[in-house]
Swiss-Prot record:
Record keywords: Aminopeptidase, Hydrolase, Protease
Reaction equations catalysed: Release of N-terminal proline from a peptide
Record-level Gene Ontology MF annotations: aminopeptidase activity
Catalytic residues identified in the record: 103, 242, 269
Annotated localization: Cell envelope
Protein encoded by which gene: pip
Biological source species: Lacticaseibacillus rhamnosus (strain Lc 705)
Protein name in the entry: Proline iminopeptidase
């Protein structure tokens, strides 16, 4: 299978991109990773899908993965990543495309669609993404209530003191993420998941120390009242055991005209991992219906 890798100049930085498969009449989906501070790595688990004849395009947002890792904290704002998305479409001549954004990637999609009125978007898949960080934080604190008393106490103490280095807090947060997000990669995990994402700085500056203490540059993110501007086909996806709770997903669906929703049973924040075959099937059916 053909894989093309390269870099796009972006200001004084560079953005890594990866294209899997050959061009065809079927429009390629642009895969937008989460975080902020993750990388394209987990999307490599979709490489086999390109063998169906549909090319896949993925990239590392600046501050992540194989892209430049600026020390300037002013880089790590939604405006930078939206500008980068605009530039990448132009650089790769993506005049017509589908888009799939996972977690923060879906938030970036929503911001891009409501602020830039882009043309040539065949369809959009928003996977596990909130339109409002305020609602996200509220729901994370509700999910915390399902943890043990000891873990709840450790998290509450960390939030009260601002000390997110205590070993009890770190262990509690690990269990929280394993319950609602994904399993921490180990030696048995697929190779792409074991690779570093290099996005710690981006994550701390843009998001904060964890999923429920959002005090970074995107802490005021809320495009809920702008979602009515989206007039392309949209599929929202989420899991039953997801950081992106059904309430969060529904708040997106309810505000986008004509949006559809697929809820993955027994799935946490990455249905691509927890329900891989179903995820690929849902994606394939969605893209085919909107080519």
């Amino acid at each position: 299978m053909k894989i093309k890798e390269g870099y796009m100049p972006f200001h004084e930085y560079k953005t890594y991109y990866r294209i899997v498969g050959e061009p065809s009449a079927d429009k390629a989906p642009l895969l937008i990773h989460g975080g902020p501070g993750s990388s394209h790595n987990y999307f490599e688990l979709m490489d086999d899908y390109a063998e169906t004849g549909r090319q896949l395009i993925m990239y590392d947002q600046v501050g992540c993965g194989k892209s430049s890792l600026p020390e300037d904290p002013g880089v790590y704002v939604k405006e930078t990543w939206a500008e980068e998305l605009v530039a990448l479409r132009k650089f790769l001549h993506l005049d017509e495309l589908h888009m799939l954004g996972q977690s923060w990637g879906g938030m970036l999609e929503m911001y891009y669609l409501t602020s830039f009125d882009p043309q040539g978007i065949k369809s959009v898949m928003i996977d596990g993404s909130p339109a409002s960080i305020k609602l996200w934080v509220q729901e994370q604190h509700r999910l915390i209530k399902y943890l043990s008393y000891e873990d709840r106490a450790a998290i509450a103490e960390a939030e009260r003191t601002g000390d997110f280095t205590n070993v009890k807090y770190l262990a509690a947060n690990d269990r929280y993420m394993e319950k609602y997000c994904w399993d921490d990669p180990d030696e048995n995990s697929p190779e792409p998941l074991r690779r570093p994402t290099n996005g710690k700085r981006a994550s701390l500056i843009a998001e904060g120390p964890n999923e429920f203490t959002e005090n970074g540059t995107i802490s005021d993110f809320d495009v809920t009242d702008q979602l009515h501007k989206i007039h392309v086909p949209v599929l929202v996806t989420s899991g039953t055991d997801d950081l992106c709770t059904p309430l969060i997903a529904k708040s997106v669906v309810d505000h986008i005209p004509g949006a559809k929703w697929h809820l993955f049973a027994n799935s946490r924040h990455l249905a691509l991992l927890d329900q891989h075959d179903e995820f690929i099937h849902v994606l394939d059916q969605w893209l085919a219906a909107n080519d």
